[in-house]
Amino acid sequence: MGLGSYWGEVLDVLQEIIPVYDKVNSYISLGKDSEHRNRAIDGRIQDGDKILDAGSGFGNMSKTALDITNGKVEIMLYDPLLPMIKNTNRLFKKKPEAACGVFEHAPCKNQQFDVVLSGYSLRDAISLKTAISEIHRVLKNDGKWIIVDLGKPDKAII
């Protein structure tokens, strides 16, 4: 599973919607995107955690984590689109460490992170199997992977 050969097309679409990216996330989540991020993160991260925000976009998941811990976590933003990472300054007083790349090839050490966040992004992996393996590699043995995403229904609602 994963996007496979469609990944380039999806990346092109994501690049095009950068100006309205947050509005699109809100729309497709029926206005519940912030609520879902808060519910997923609250109580699951601790002060001092090292966090990888995989598929970070503008960094909304990271911003939520920083708000919940009063800034007492260490964040690394990671996204395939450099323009997304460059536009994170509107959310952060001090810009977190950031890198550009895909789920399947994280430029991180083995067991480097206490927590990996993936908000509305895992569905865009090239290869879901490889992405899961790579996230497992960079997570500490007792680490947590917090995923907020939407699925595609098998049938349309009539």
Model-identified regions with their sequence ranges:
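Conserved class I S-adenosyl-L-methionine
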Residues: 146-158
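A short SAM/SAH-binding and catalytic strip from SAM-dependent methyltransferases
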Residues: 115-127
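Short glycine-dipeptide loop
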Residues: 47, 139-144
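A short acidic, Gly/Pro-enriched loop at the edge of an enzyme's catalytic core
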Residues: 104-116
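Conserved alpha-helix/loop element of class I SAM-dependent methyltransferases that forms part
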Residues: 31-47, 64
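Class I SAM-dependent methyltransferase SAM/SAH-binding core
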Residues: 52-105
